[in-house]
Amino acid sequence: MAHTKLRIVLVEDSAIIRARLSESLTEIPNLEIVGQAETELEAVALLRGDNWDAAILDLQLRKGTGLGVLKALPQAQRIPHRTLIVFTNYAFPQYKERSMALGADYFFDKSREFHRVREVLSALAAEVPSASG
């Protein structure tokens, strides 16, 4: 990796949740939010680029779904250093199974596992080489 920060994309239709995530994540050293999307179309456009390392993906979006986003990403783009975190209020087993089958690395319930997103991203950010060496 040539960059010195873990680059995050937030895919969430709720402005309140986006703000809460942004506030929580910006406290993590070596992490920056490089993009945000509210719809499936916006998310796919961002995630087809190469300017991200991890994405937080809601299942229910303003237009479209997180499952649609996962389906639209080519398997070839799912390289090992990219992490997809599904973060949803719809944490049903069938959604988890489908999300993981489509390439999600993690699946968390917004109402009970908000802290887990931060834990995962903190660990990933700690692995990013710093600019000083």
Regions found by a protein language model. Name each.
Residues 1-7, 115-133:
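Non-catalytic signal-transmission and effector/linker regions of two-component phosphorelay proteins
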Residues 12:
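Conserved acidic carboxylate
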Residues 15-35:
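Two-component/phosphorelay signaling modules centered on CheY-like receiver
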Residues 36-54:
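Acidic, metal-coordinating helix/loop segments flanking the phosphotransfer/catalytic sites
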Residues 58-59:
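Active-site residues of response regulator receiver
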Residues 67-80:
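Short amphipathic alpha-helix used as the core "switch/output" element in two-component signaling
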Residues 68, 91-108, 112:
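Alpha4 helix (beta4-alpha4-beta5 surface) of REC/receiver domains from two-component response regulators
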